[in-house]
Curated annotation (Swiss-Prot):
May have antimicrobial activity. This is Putative antimicrobial protein 2. It comes from the Eukaryota. Residues 1-20 are annotated as: Disordered. It comes from Cenchritis muricatus. Keywords: Antimicrobial.
């Protein structure tokens, strides 16, 4: 299982939150 920083990439992008 990947961490939130990596598994929530699409969710973050969809929400407008880009945290690389």
């Amino acid at each position: 299982d990947l961490p939130e920083c990596c598994s929530a990439t699409e969710l973050e992008l969809d929400s407008g939150k880009q945290t690389s």
